[in-house]
Amino acid sequence: MPPIAHEIAASLLRAGAVHLRPDQPFTFASGLRSPVYCDNRILLGDVAARRAVTAAFTAHCDGAEVLAGPATGGIPWVAWAAETCGLPMAYVRGAAKGHGRGRLIEGVSVKGRRVVLLEDTVSTGESVLAAAAALRAEGAELVRCVCIFTWGWQATATAFSDAALPLVSLTALPELLDAATAAGSLSVAQRALVEAWVRDPQGWGADIS
């Protein structure tokens, strides 16, 4: 990844958006145990970090006529990047409105327009790929999806490949691990635990209390 990926990773750690706890794993609502927790909503309150992320997003908006994102995580980034680039924006609801015009996509019309999709975090990709399908159903031509962070799971890469949607991540787990190691907050043994989780997230952590 380019040098900016390491800068973004360091920004996420400084802002407290990412927590590494391989010896005391987090448990997600799904029951999945994880040595890493990422909440990029924290960045909304960190002016320096959000400016850095917005600038990084705009570098990947070439070729776009519209910027769009899924509700709710993508909305602020789409708004800031669209303002910076001087582009119109849209966002995709989780479900169509149950009243009024019953719209699923809000904002500018995407029909016949080249759209870059922005998201904060991509895990399995399920929600952002649903948004992509909705945009395509409205006639959008999707250029790429850009996210702040992704875990690097092979299943996610496969899902985006199957959807014929290029995925670009501003930073990823290796860069975060490099930043944490450089800061002295992650040992070599702890890093190995995190890397093992990436390879097998479902089976990881059975022997950790």
Predicted feature residues:
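Short glycine-rich phosphate-binding loop at a beta-alpha junction
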Residues: 64-71, 146
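Conserved acidic residues
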Residues: 65, 113, 143
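Generic structural signal for helix capping and beta-alpha/helix-loop junctions
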Residues: 76, 99-100, 152, 177
